């Protein structure tokens, strides 16, 4: 669990882990990828240790930063894809994101880029969440502030709310929010909504 750990602590853990893992991975064996809690920073540390130990790096990890041969817009791909897919469903019904109010769960990679793309398409995203609670901002979540808080400072959403005068932080699940919105985009795990928690909402 990387919460509360320094970059140096995370790096040492990743290096120790790769020292053992490197015996079992490779282009013709297994190619690990990032997942929840394992982003570009962690993949970079793992990649560096593998290369140091083997003097070879081709095809051994996916999700590397661009500087290490990673793919362009890989970090954005899932969040963008969710919004593009949803936009096509809306178009098929004569609708679009434009003018819609959107609730997003999560505040990690997928949530951040779903927020960015939905906003670009004309929606107002009013929420993001983490494991402790959620933020509601009827004026729209600030993408730049969110990424600064979550990616650079690696802080909680309480810090976001403290810096955004129009934002309010609530404890609990975002799916208990009783306000009005048009589209729900679940971008966190576990998915904590059901037909009981959202009886009157349109889930796309």
Where are these regions (language model features)?
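Short, glycine-/Ser/Thr-/acidic-enriched flexible segments
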Residues: 38, 89, 109-110, 133, ...
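Accessory "access/gating" subregions that flank catalytic or transport cores
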Residues: 161-193
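Structural motif
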Residues: 19, 28-31, 58-59, 65, ...
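Conserved small/polar residues in nucleotide/adenosyl-binding loops
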Residues: 194-200
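Glycine/serine-rich phosphate-binding loop and adjoining beta1-alpha1 elements at the start
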Residues: 1-97
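Hydrophobic alpha-helical scaffolding
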Residues: 3, 7, 36, 72-76, ...
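Glycine-rich phosphate/diphosphate-binding loop of Rossmann-like nucleotide-binding domains
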Residues: 76, 80-169
């Amino acid at each position: 669990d990387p919460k509360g750990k320094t970059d140096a602590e995370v790096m040492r853990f990743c290096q120790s882990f790769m020292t053992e893992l490197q015996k079992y991975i490779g282009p013709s064996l297994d190619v690990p990828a990032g997942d929840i809690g394992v982003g570009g920073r962690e993949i970079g540390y793992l990649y560096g240790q593998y290369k140091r130990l083997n003097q070879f790096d081709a095809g051994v990890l996916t999700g590397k930063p661009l500087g290490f041969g990673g793919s362009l817009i890989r970090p954005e791909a899932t969040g963008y894809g969710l919004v593009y897919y949803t936009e096509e469903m809306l178009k098929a019904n004569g609708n679009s994101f434009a003018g819609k109010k959107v609730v997003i769960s999560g505040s990690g990679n997928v949530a951040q880029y779903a927020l960015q793309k939905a906003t670009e398409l004309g929606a107002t995203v009013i929420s993001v969440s983490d494991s402790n609670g959620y933020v509601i901002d009827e004026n729209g979540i600030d993408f730049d502030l969110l990424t600064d808080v979550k990616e650079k400072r690696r802080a909680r959403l309480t810090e976001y709310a403290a810096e955004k005068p129009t934002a309010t932080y609530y404890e609990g699940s975002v799916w208990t929010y009783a306000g009005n919105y048009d589209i729900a985009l679940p971008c966190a795990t576990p998915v904590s909504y059901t037909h009981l928690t959202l009886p009157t909402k349109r889930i796309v």
